[in-house]
UniProtKB/Swiss-Prot annotation:
It is a multi-pass membrane protein. Interacts with the Sec translocase complex via SecD. Specifically interacts with transmembrane segments of nascent integral membrane proteins during membrane integration. Signal peptide: none annotated. It comes from Helicobacter hepaticus (strain ATCC 51449 / 3B1). Its main location: membrane. GO terms for biological process: protein insertion into membrane; protein transport. This is Membrane protein insertase YidC. PANTHER family: CYTOCHROME C OXIDASE ASSEMBLY PROTEIN COX18, MITOCHONDRIAL, OXA1. The keyword Cell membrane applies. Keywords: Cell inner membrane, Cell membrane, Chaperone, Membrane, Protein transport, Transmembrane, Transmembrane helix, Transport. The chain crosses the membrane at residues 16-36, 388-408, 450-470, 485-505, 531-551. Gene3D superfamilies: 2.70.98.90. It is found in: Cell inner membrane. Belongs to the OXA1/ALB3/YidC family. Type 1 subfamily.
């Protein structure tokens, strides 16, 4: 009885190993590119702590870091001490000043609140797109059905972007301890308490009178949530720091980057400070890179609070961290100052319209260089068809067309391997005791018939970076939030609520696999290979992906099936012609 040796099933084993390797690589790369943080909103945890304990922790763990980065022309020890005293004074912020709202700006799109400390305390978004909240966890759904976890489906007419007790936008701190404490004890006044924003910008003037020092903040707020800032101090040479605030807390997604991004004003290099990673060592290591920044942005998955400047020297950014190592950004000024800011969704063209460099705030991770043009292509397709779901279908078609030459070669190569299987088996029987000769004859056989045992894997390998880039685009692009496709798919950025797409994806993957030629000699290898569609299906259900991504994968499988059927017909036609030609040749010889 014939028993295949190592050379017998070497090529089929290679294909199985590559397929399994790609599957493992898929999960490994996914974990690498999209590491999941513990599902804990560190800002909310920060809020829940006692204020005094929090401020003592900030003073102990982060103040020195900020001080070593500010005012390099000063004596470092003096600078460190002054800013340390300044930050520690925040523990004495009167609770009433933090809670008192002195001005409101209201529009159809948003509502903005300014408190008695002269800070932008809260921004509410009113668009239905941002108010909607989809369930994003299979386990949460199951728990809700079983009554193990209460549903959080509170109805709201606006979305708050920030937590209550975090570092807020436009918060000022002074190096001079006495000025700093007095500033925290003295409320601001506003020239107007309520403004209805229509189509034109509005200006709010905030004034703080400290006796020997008068501070004026001129905020010009635009309808798109961009704003211009002009700071005037009645005394010159006063060193102070203004924060763009800690990141918004409206989105609790744990796969997206959350923290602070700065862009170097000279070379455009981005420096990132992720929540939980802003240790003193990391802050010190990156201190020099952020001292001249074109922008500093606190970001979560969909939203940002940022400062930017077109000044030649940019913004002098200094960074601290709270007790949970979440970044706390500041910009250093001395005397009067002017800059601009923005609070709101990270919509690409909105940011581009404000300042072109702000598009770097839309962060797609390590593959941004590939994901950003992919998003622009997807957006172009959306402009053509008016639906993000159909845009994904068109994008998938374009990807398949671009990869078709390689896909065709790979599929033809796999068909040739299947056709050569009897000859390969004959060689394996003939040279079973001489592996070296077997290898030589097999290579000659491949060369003679133009077959490549690895050719079928190349198209799949090339699709992996496309897959991850599309994942980042669909997961991070706020433009797709709450965007419906058809029927039950009401949000392409959330999971399929009924898991229909993951099942269809698995079925289409199985059909594609059945149509693809195979030349397995080991039944175990074949079984393992056939399990892959179900492994992927289960993975897509237990660890759910956005519906848009599963749609891409499913449509990709459908196009693959169509391509495979057409290629199979082409190959069958070629075979029929070869058989007919061979038959004619024999007939002619007999004649």
């Amino acid at each position: 009885m014939y028993r295949p040796n190592e050379q017998d099933n070497g090529m089929s084993l290679t294909r199985v190993l590559i397929a399994i390797g790609l599957s493992i690589a898929f999960f490994a790369i996914y974990a690498y590119f999209f590491p999941q943080k513990p599902h804990q909103n560190t800002h909310q945890a920060h809020t829940a702590q006692n204020t005094q304990d929090t401020q003592e922790s900030i003073q102990a763990s982060t103040h020195t870091e900020i001080n070593t980065q500010v005012a390099p022309h000063q004596n470092i020890q003096d600078s460190t001490q002054s800013v340390q005293n300044e930050i520690s004074s925040s523990a004495q912020m009167p609770h009433s000043l933090k809670q008192t709202i002195i001005a409101r700006v209201d529009s159809d799109e948003f509502e903005l609140e300014i408190d008695a400390l002269g800070r932008i305390k809260q921004v509410y978004l009113k668009d239905e797109k941002f108010i909607r909240h989809e369930q994003t966890s299979l386990f949460a759904m199951i728990g809700e059905v079983l009554g193990m976890k209460p549903a959080h489906k509170e109805k709201r007419d606006k979305l708050p972007l920030f937590g209550d007790s975090q570092l807020h936008t436009m918060e000022m701190r002074f190096s001079d301890t006495s000025i700093n404490q007095q500033a925290f004890d003295t409320p601001y006044t506003a020239n107007i308490s309520y403004i209805k924003l229509e189509n034109a910008p509005v200006e709010i003037v905030l004034t703080q009178n400290l006796g020997n020092l008068v501070i004026k903040k001129y905020l010009t707020i635009h309808p798109n949530l961009a704003y211009d800032v002009r700071l005037e101090l009645s005394k010159p040479n006063i060193e102070y720091f203004v924060s763009n605030g800690m990141r918004p807390t409206a989105d609790t997604d744990t796969y997206a980057f959350r923290g602070v991004i700065t862009r170097n004003n000279i070379d455009g290099v981005l420096t990132k400070f992720e929540d939980g990673d802003a240790s003193s060592d990391y802050l010190a290591k990156n201190a020099a890179d952020i001292r001249s920044s074109s922008f500093v942005a606190s970001v979560d998955r969909y939203y940002t609070s940022l400062f930017f400047s077109n000044a030649p020297k940019g913004l002098y950014v200094v960074m601290s961290g709270d007790n949970a190592h979440n970044p706390m950004p500041y910009v250093r000024f001395e005397g009067d100052a002017e800059f601009a800011g923005y609070i709101g969704p990270k919509e690409y063209h909105e940011l581009q319209g404000i300042e072109n460099t702000l598009t770097d705030v839309v962060e797609y991770g390590r593959i941004t260089f590939f994901a950003k043009p992919l998003f622009l292509l997807l957006e172009y397709l959306y402009d053509l068809c008016g639906n993000w779901g159909w845009a994904i279908v068109l994008l998938t078609l374009i990807v398949r067309i671009v990869l078709y030459p390689l896909t065709y070669k790979g599929m033809v190569s796999m068909q040739k391997l299947k056709d050569l299987a009897p000859k390969m088996k004959d060689l394996q029987t003939r040279y079973k005791d001489d592996p070296q000769k077997l290898q030589i004859h097999m290579m000659d056989l491949y060369k003679k018939h133009g077959a490549n045992p690895l050719g079928g894997c190349l198209p799949l390998i090339l699709q992996i970076p496309v897959f991850f880039a599309i994942y980042r685009v669909l997961h991070n692009a706020v433009e797709l939030k709450s965007s419906a496709w058809i029927l039950w798919i009401t949000d392409l950025s959330a999971i399929d609520p009924y898991f229909v797409l993951p099942v269809l994806m698995g079925v289409s993957m199985y059909i594609s696999q059945k149509l693809t030629p195979s030349n397995f000699t080991d039944p175990m290898q074949e079984k393992i290979f056939k399990m892959l569609p179900w492994v992927f299906t289960i993975f897509f259900i237990i660890f759910p992906f956005p519906a848009g991504l599963v749609l891409y994968w499913t449509i990709n499988n459908v196009f693959s099936i169509i391509q495979q059927i057409s290629i199979n017909k082409i190959m069958e036609g070629k075979k029929a012609k070869e058989i007919a030609a061979h038959h004619d040749e024999k007939t002619n010889k007999r004649g």
